[in-house]
């Protein structure tokens, strides 16, 4: 009588056999159809190795189970997505920081003079941070497209149009809240020494310092937007705006001069918005001005020390540029000394 224990190859399984005889996880992988492995064996009479496919008791070659094939494809897709997002974050940083660094050389020649080694260090730390930012972003980008994990939507009519700008404000406020409190935590002595000192090693910071973080600090910054997109609906275009604004503000807050008009940092509006004039004072005094976009938490918690100015740094840059024979040499030195005395 023919044996009834032999099953057909995996490619010929019926849907019931794929699910398992018992219809549950325990019966999902039949024991006589193990994962196909290729084991090296010596070819008779030659001593050379050849590959031998594992077969079941009936001589049928064994194929990978559907679970293994799906898991392999999933891991490959997630890895590629994470690598792609790392590349995007890194290139975005290089383009934006590079553009503002070039603008600095035109607007304030000599401001970054003597900081070449520091800027190389800032770029190295920032590119390492780009990988840390890219991994969770890549995983969620894959999960959004493949499984709808996030609350990101691409149909602008899926929600009322007024919700689009509202979601931007909500995201910015929550991001600012997260940044303020994690930033204050970073200034606790032990944490500062272990991690945040990397960022404050830039004295003064340059346009390249926006993402110059220790990995511990980079992780605290990398998780906030992924957490928000899991919880709060946002249109893909609005999310792009938030990410773009985050990058621009991170760079301009560190580049050593004020790019925004005075009403944004010196008038009533400036009492609530953070630009380079506000954040520069944090890098000078450390124990104040912790916010990212808004001065709300600094003012509420008594850590707001107002805005600073760049007169002394700009005067020093003007003297350095004049001494190097730059185009401002014909009077830049005297102007620089006057500005320095005024500061």
Where are each of the predicted segments found?
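A cross-taxon signal for low-complexity, glycine/charged-rich
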Residues: 1-3, 19-32, 36, 40, ...
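Alpha-helical transmembrane segments in multi-pass membrane proteins
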Residues: 75-133
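Hydrophobic alpha-helical transmembrane segments of multi-pass integral membrane proteins
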Residues: 87, 91-94, 99, 127-143, ...
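Function-critical hydrophobic alpha-helical transmembrane segments in multi-pass membrane proteins
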Residues: 161-200, 206-214, 222
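Alpha-helical transmembrane segments
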Residues: 77-92, 163-174, 239-243
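Cytosolic/stromal cytosol-facing helical appendages immediately following the last transmembrane segment
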Residues: 71-75, 79-84, 106-116, 197, ...
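Transmembrane alpha-helical segments that form the membrane-embedded catalytic/substrate-channel core
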Residues: 90-100, 170-188, 242-260
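Juxtamembrane helix-loop-helix connectors linking adjacent transmembrane helices
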Residues: 135-174
């Amino acid at each position: 009588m023919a044996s009834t224990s032999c099953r057909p190859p995996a490619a010929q399984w019926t849907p019931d056999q794929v699910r398992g005889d018992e219809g549950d996880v325990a019966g999902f992988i039949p024991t006589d159809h193990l994962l196909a492995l290729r084991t090296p064996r010596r070819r008779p009479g030659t001593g050379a190795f050849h590959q031998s496919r594992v077969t079941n008791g009936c001589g049928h070659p064994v194929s990978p189970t559907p679970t293994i094939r799906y898991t392999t494809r999933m891991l490959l897709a997630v890895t590629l997505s994470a690598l792609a997002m790392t590349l995007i974050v890194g290139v975005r940083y290089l383009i934006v920081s590079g553009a503002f660094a070039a603008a600095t050389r035109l607007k304030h020649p000599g401001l970054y003079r003597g900081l070449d080694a520091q800027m190389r260090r800032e770029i190295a730390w920032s590119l390492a941070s780009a990988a840390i930012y890219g991994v969770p972003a890549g995983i969620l980008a894959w999960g959004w497209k493949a499984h709808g994990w996030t609350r990101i939507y691409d149909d602008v009519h899926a929600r009322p149009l007024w919700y689009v700008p509202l979601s931007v404000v909500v995201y910015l406020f929550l991001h600012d809240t997260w940044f303020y409190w994690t930033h204050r935590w970073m200034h606790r002595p032990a944490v500062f020494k272990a991690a945040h000192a990397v960022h404050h090693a830039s004295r003064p910071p340059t346009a390249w310092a926006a993402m110059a973080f220790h990995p511990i600090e980079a992780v605290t910054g990398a998780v906030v937007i992924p957490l928000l997109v899991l919880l709060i609906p946002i249109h893909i275009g609005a999310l792009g705006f938030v990410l773009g604004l985050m990058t621009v503000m991170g760079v301009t807050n560190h580049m050593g001069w004020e790019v925004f008009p005075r009403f944004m940092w010196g008038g009533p509006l400036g009492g609530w918005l953070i630009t380079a004039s506000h954040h520069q004072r944090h890098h000078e005094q450390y124990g104040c001005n912790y916010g990212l976009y808004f001065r709300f938490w600094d003012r509420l918690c008594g850590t707001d020390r107002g805005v600073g100015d760049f007169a002394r740094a700009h005067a020093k840059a003007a003297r350095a540029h004049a001494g190097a024979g730059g185009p401002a040499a014909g009077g830049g030195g005297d102007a620089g000394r006057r500005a320095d005395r005024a500061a």
